Amino acid sequence: MTSIRALVLVIVALSVQLVYSQVETILDSSEYDDLGLPTATELKPQIAGFLANDGTDLFPAVSMSNDGPSMAYQQRASVSNYANNPFIARAEQYRKAHSSSTRPQSISSQQQQQQQQQGYDPRDGTPYTRDIAVKQGILRGFVRVMHPQSGLKNVDQFLGIPYAEAPVGSRRFMPPSAPIPWNGLKMATKLSPVCPQNLPSLNNANNNYSKGRYDQIKRLLPYLKVESEDCLYLNLYVPSYDGIGPQTKYPVIVYIHGESYEWNSGNPYDGSILASYGQVIVVTLNFRLGILGFMKPGISDHTTSNFGLLDQIAALQWIKENIGAFGGDAKLVTVMGQGTGAACVNFLMVSPVAKGLFHRAILMSGSALSDWALTQHPLQSTMQVLQGLNCPLNGENDEVTACLRRKRYSEILGVKTASPQFSTRFGPIVDGLVIPNMPHKVMGQYSDIFSGYDLLYGMTELESYHILNAVALTYGLLENERDNLLRFYMQNRFEIRPDLALAATLREYTDIYMDPNKALADEHRDNLLEILSDARVAAPMVQTGLYLSKVNPKCYMYVFGHNSEAGEYGRLSQSVVGEDLAYVFGAPLGQVGPFQHHYNARERLFSEAVMKYFTNFAKTG
């Protein structure tokens, strides 16, 4: 396990970098006000749909209690008056000014009363759910019948529910709009297409992946084959109501998928076992990825971006308005993410646009403070794409966007752009609205923005395991190979004296970790993995927890320390990134999602414990 002394060193190094960061944020522009929001009036209608809300509780006053459990390093602190926060005040002004923005249409009272007796699919006998009335129309899903010996209750699945209008044609590179109502009954029994994406190659001729990583990706890819720009759908996994006694209001867990900002989907992650065991509603969703989801589609400071995050906000808005029809509690919504999904959740925690849409957060192996969480040079990425598509580099925003909309999405995905190691090509950016400022500034200076969220966060022990290829993981590294890779990382991470950061880090880690009984090549490899795991994931997550624990005592940290014994990493002494997901979704209790299917009795009990911890947090914080 990573030593505290080494972890503190990385935290200090990261803090120094934050102090001396030379990144010029959007807030320094005269075209944005002192709160980081655009002054241009033409942008206001575009964001109105996200700042408008049917009720007054989108930006509620925060009442915090200092009572409750806390970690050893947590401190009590008074919370600033929520109404005095400038970010929230400006967002509230927009919300009130545009309260007449289009909202999802309500269905008639006659439709709301239409409830059909449970039927069966005539093709295979699969039982249907009861009909559910949401604002857009009537939905019918199917029941997943659990094996009687499992001890699990049945789960109603509603798959492929549109939470926003399809972002095609003139809607491409635009914020999501409300979903279009439908007439009659909509069968919610099939997963939707995934959003357009460039999938990782399984060509392992150069041993790009370890055997374990290769097998993981191979299991995941079949879920991602059918894609379309019409992809803004979510899936609900709801404990079946047996009709006996009053129906319970279930807490809600919304899962934001990880792996990458450029590929993957919520579809592979079947929430049935987690929903049944924990008696919660589990929601998975798709959001726009890569260029279509995160590229800034223009060179003007006023260009709207972060469409992937706006999609997530739109999904949370749909959940808030409709989850009650499924027996869910709109006041008990937890958003959970892993990897890049965890960074997205953290961004939503500091976004005034997402206020009031969820109440608790679970961060797994990621943070908004991680060096990979933001695209640091979005304009460079945009210029490369425009050049590759022969779109005007110096045109007005409308001209550039029109050119991008004329292209087939396959052309857009096919553009070749530079992808240096340790950098993010197309991910969230500081836009002054969804992400109002650099996350460390928002969490440090405007902590009341995210103080209302309870937080559970944690990591595995080898978060950077997949950085190395199979050869390096098997045979280790030479000292100069380790140092060259670390030197390149430090140069990308620190603008001031990266050589000093490298020297101090190596001195600290080699002093702690040098093992005379281990081969030098293995030692150098393990040094590298420990340093990068701490610097890129562990230290940023601990810092996020420190920020929040100062204003909210319900802040809990865990370390996941188990690899499946029959899985890809069973021989390793430390847990590998992503190994926790199978236990959170209950894979040892039954076949769900893209996980291996060989678990022993002890691991089934362990999965039950993990699900209990996570769902208890969703229920009570």
PLM regions: where:
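Residue-level preference for long, well-ordered alpha-helices that form the structural scaffold
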Residues: 301-304, 308, 371-374, 378, ...
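Substrate-gating cap/lid region and adjacent catalytic-acid/histidine neighborhood
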Residues: 406, 410-601, 613
